[in-house]
Design a protein with these regions (language model features):
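Short secondary-structure boundary/hinge segments and terminal tails
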Residues: 23-24, 41-43, 107-110, 145-149
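Pocket-lining segment of extracytoplasmic ligand-binding domains
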Residues: 2-91
Length: 157
């Protein structure tokens, strides 16, 4: 509905996920203004963070570590074998769309985000949220971080 709304002049802009917007950007229907995928100031930011319920993490530390390690190894594989990874996704119907667009999007991501970069990004987000009043600014960023994040692995690729 957002795309049609922009085409009809009913809305001027929309916030869309890059994966959703890409086909419309590729065919010239829309132009992106800012992108978490392509803008230089976002390129070192993790797009996603693997999260576990704190009770589950406390009760299953081995599972959490193994899952996180597997997730990290998968990221390294994708980074080093992007086309093969995309083929696996497409063959199993875990991805859909135009192969060239999918490949361009996958090549734009950094799948080897370290714990340190994750920590730095979370501290930036906490500072922004405190600045805008989304979360309490009485606590230090490190205190807030300690409540929401616990690194599982060392920075080993």
């Amino acid at each position: 509905a957002c795309i049609q709304g922009m085409q009809n002049g009913e809305i001027a802009a929309a916030v869309l996920e890059d994966q959703y917007a890409m086909p419309f950007v590729s065919d010239g229907t829309i132009t992106y203004i800012r992108s978490l995928t392509y803008d230089d100031d976002f390129k070192v930011e993790p797009c996603c963070i693997l999260a576990f319920n704190s009770d589950f993490a406390k009760e299953n530390p081995v599972h959490v570590k193994r899952y996180t390690r597997a997730f990290q190894k998968a990221g390294v594989f994708i980074e080093q074998n992007t086309e093969q990874a995309l083929d696996i996704l497409l063959q199993n119907s875990w991805a859909s769309g135009d192969r060239d667009d999918d490949l361009a999007l996958m090549q734009a991501f950094d799948y080897t985000i370290t714990e340190q970069r994750t920590k730095d990004s979370l501290l930036d987000i906490i500072a922004d949220y405190q600045k805008y009043g989304v979360i309490d600014s009485e606590q230090s960023a490190d205190e807030v971080l300690a409540k929401v994040w616990a690194p599982v692995l060392d920075d080993v690729q």
